[in-house]
């Protein structure tokens, strides 16, 4: 007699000849009983004879049953690509049911372990149990559905289908279009779905996620190569904020070779002085009044043939031709200088108004003066930078050709809405302002304050102005800056009886016309100049860069450099004029760019360093990424080449392979990253093959013709 837990006792046997029998298990019952099972009350203590007989009957039944098949070990996900040996579906059914039953703790098992005296006996029908085989192993017969049990018996006799990791493949020689086969195929789909769900649940539980591998949001699948990047594509929603290209893309400074540098500095006489800092290439002669002698003399073998288009710069006059570019630059500079004088005058008036508002303790007048002072100072800053840039451009010998006026665009921005932090409650203490800048144009919205008496449950602020920018280039960028300041609180003095009597006495003793008889010591203009310049109290709390691609209705964007109380997003409406279809064409491919040598040893040996990039020609600019996947996933390009700043009349293949690469061509650009310094650089590129070279040259030259037509 085997030992068993004292808390569980065997059931009482039924009379001989009954149609039902009891089954007792030494291990806890963890399965779901059938619907026709009935329960018996706990057996009282003291009936030792009946307990011994019942135990002998149950132990004899367990010895006749075969042991359950061993559970196969589930392989880890690392070996998932290795195909397991083919096995029949019927052999997997008891394993899956056993694994599922081991993880599930039934209420009967809980009741068994909680210390109830006696055994809960489950009664099964003896007719079905004696006639049907035990498909589920040591588990009750009613735990397996009827369809799956019959299908497993049929699959043991004849194998019609073969299941693998990908799906269910049908053997063509054993399958015919009959009603029985169709029914079997439907039942097989049900079986495969049950087995697949059980395997997926086990794989998910056994999988261990690595924190480092999940930081970049990349997911590797067994059917995808490891070197291919797969990003989780989220569905685009108009309410979801977007990121914009915050800084303007620049031409790589390390690419190519410098040709000429132009720097602008102020001379001793007070006027601007243009100086050429570096000239690495001899200038090409423009014209001369005296041609070369002996032009018709036959050349010698040692001398190169004469170039009839070459000539020397004439020493008679300083200008060999009319320089329209210099004339236009002077006109623009004169207009800017006049605008600078007006801006400085407006700054003086705004400072004087601000001082008066602070003395009179008028908050609304102080906010208006602060707004005008901020706008004028920002406008003066960009105007001075533009003047320095134009002064440096006047000495450029071959400036870029002018752009067609049809490519000038107009953009209107309206309904700017800022979102507040959810913890922001002091609405009456701040005033907000939005400032927009593009080259020398500076526009701003009105000052909006959130007064305490107008508190609403909405946690955003709306600017209803329409701001318009015109005469914009193809690759324009508009900078948006959000400013805030604390609203000055000027509380009126308390009117006590003593203060009221003192004011009455002062009015009686001092005559009303005493202020008119006071002598004026200085003029208002001199007082404005002598007064100290007050500081602007508006503080930058967020910025954003807008371009042509950011136009649309109800667009949401993330802000940069956000501080409290802003939440970090902005919603606005923007509309921009469309470009002609000819400039909107796209051309893609790989290009190699020559970079400068970083180490002194490589510079001494003149070892060329080529880098391969994925390139896109679109809207008059060539954008560069490291791989094509970066463009697909809308990552920010590494740099760009702006063809509007190209000084070449046309792009052609280089005749000499100076850097040891085939299919070369170069583009000369004017780079003005610093307003006081303009550099002319030659960017050397190379294509993959001759066909790619011809395609790139054709696409770039067509773009230049469209821009300059």
From Swiss-Prot:
Q: Which InterPro entries match?
A: AHD, Cytokinesis/Rho-signaling, PH-like_dom_sf, PH_Anillin, PH_domain
Domain PH span(s) in chain numbering: 584-705
CC annotations in GO:
actomyosin contractile ring
Q: Which SMART domains match?
A: PH
Q: Its GO biological process terms?
A: actomyosin contractile ring assembly; mitotic cytokinesis; septin ring organization
Name by which UniProt lists this protein: Anillin-like protein 3
Q: Which organism is it from?
A: Caenorhabditis elegans
């Amino acid at each position: 007699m085997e030992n068993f837990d004292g808390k569980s006792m065997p059931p009482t046997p039924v009379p001989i000849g009954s149609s039902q029998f009891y089954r007792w298990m030494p291990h806890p019952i963890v399965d779901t009983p059938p619907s026709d099972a009935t329960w018996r009350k706990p057996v009282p203590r003291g009936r030792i004879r009946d307990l011994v007989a019942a135990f002998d009957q149950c132990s004899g039944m367990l010895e006749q049953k075969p042991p359950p098949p061993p559970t196969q070990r589930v392989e880890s996900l690392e070996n998932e690509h290795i195909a397991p040996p083919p096995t029949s579906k019927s052999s997997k059914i008891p394993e899956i049911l056993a694994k599922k039953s081991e993880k599930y703790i039934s209420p009967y098992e809980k009741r068994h372990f909680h210390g109830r005296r006696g055994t809960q006996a489950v009664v099964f029908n003896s007719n079905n149990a004696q006639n049907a085989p035990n498909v589920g192993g040591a588990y009750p017969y009613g735990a397996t559905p009827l369809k799956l049990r019959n299908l497993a018996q049929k699959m043991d006799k004849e194998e019609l289908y073969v299941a693998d990791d990908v799906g269910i493949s049908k053997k063509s020689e054993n399958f015919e279009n009959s009603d029985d086969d169709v029914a079997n195929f439907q039942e097989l789909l049900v079986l495969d779905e049950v087995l697949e769900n059980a395997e997926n649940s086990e794989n998910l539980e056994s999988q261990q996620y690595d924190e480092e591998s999940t930081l970049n949001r990349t997911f590797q699948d067994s059917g995808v190569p490891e070197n291919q990047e797969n990003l989780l594509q989220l569905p685009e929603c108009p309410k979801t904020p977007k990121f914009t290209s915050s800084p303007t893309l620049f031409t790589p400074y390390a690419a190519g070779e410098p040709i000429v540098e132009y720097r602008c500095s102020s001379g001793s006489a007070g006027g601007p002085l243009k100086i050429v800092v570096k000239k690495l290439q001899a200038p090409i002669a423009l014209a001369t009044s005296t041609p070369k002698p002996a032009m018709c003399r036959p050349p010698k073998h040692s001398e190169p043939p004469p170039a009839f288009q070459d000539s020397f710069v004439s020493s008679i006059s300083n200008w060999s031709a009319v320089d329209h570019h210099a004339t236009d630059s002077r006109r623009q500079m004169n207009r800017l200088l006049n605008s600078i004088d007006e801006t400085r005058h407006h700054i003086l008036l705004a400072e004087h108004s601000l001082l008066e508002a602070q003395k009179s303790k008028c908050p609304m007048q102080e906010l208006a003066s602060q707004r005008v002072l901020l706008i004028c100072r920002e406008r003066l800053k960009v105007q001075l930078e533009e003047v320095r840039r134009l002064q440096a451009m006047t000495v450029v010998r071959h400036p870029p050709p002018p752009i067609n006026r049809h490519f000038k665009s107009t953009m209107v921005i309206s309904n700017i809405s800022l979102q507040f932090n959810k913890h922001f409650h002091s609405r009456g203490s701040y005033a907000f302002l939005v400032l927009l800048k593009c080259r020398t144009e500076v526009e701003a919205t009105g000052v909006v304050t959130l007064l305490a008496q107008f508190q609403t449950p909405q946690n955003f602020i709306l600017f209803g102005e329409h701001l318009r920018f015109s005469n914009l280039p193809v690759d324009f960028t508009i900078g948006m800056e959000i400013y805030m300041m604390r609203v000055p609180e000027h509380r009126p003095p308390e009117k006590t009886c003593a203060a009221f009597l003192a004011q009455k006495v002062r009015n009686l003793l001092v005559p009303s016309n005493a202020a008119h008889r006071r002598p004026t010591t200085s003029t208002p203009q001199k007082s404005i100049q002598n007064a100290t310049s007050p500081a602007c109290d508006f503080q930058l709390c967020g910025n954003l860069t807008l371009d042509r691609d950011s136009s649309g209705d109800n667009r949401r964007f993330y802000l940069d450099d956000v501080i409290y109380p802003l939440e970090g997003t902005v919603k606005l409406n923007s509309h921009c004029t469309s470009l002609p279809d000819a400039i909107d064409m796209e051309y893609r491919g790989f290009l190699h760019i020559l970079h400068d040598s970083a180490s002194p040893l490589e510079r001494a040996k003149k070892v060329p360093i080529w880098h391969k990039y994925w390139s896109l020609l679109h809207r008059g600019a060539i954008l560069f990424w490291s791989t094509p996947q970066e463009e697909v996933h809308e990552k920010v390009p590494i740099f760009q080449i702006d063809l509007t700043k190209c000084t070449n009349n046309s792009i052609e293949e280089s005749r000499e392979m100076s850097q040891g690469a085939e299919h070369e061509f170069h583009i000369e650009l004017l780079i003005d990253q610093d307003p006081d310094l303009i550099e002319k650089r030659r960017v050397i590129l190379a294509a993959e093959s001759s066909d790619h070279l011809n395609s790139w040259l054709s696409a770039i030259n067509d773009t230049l013709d469209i821009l300059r037509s």
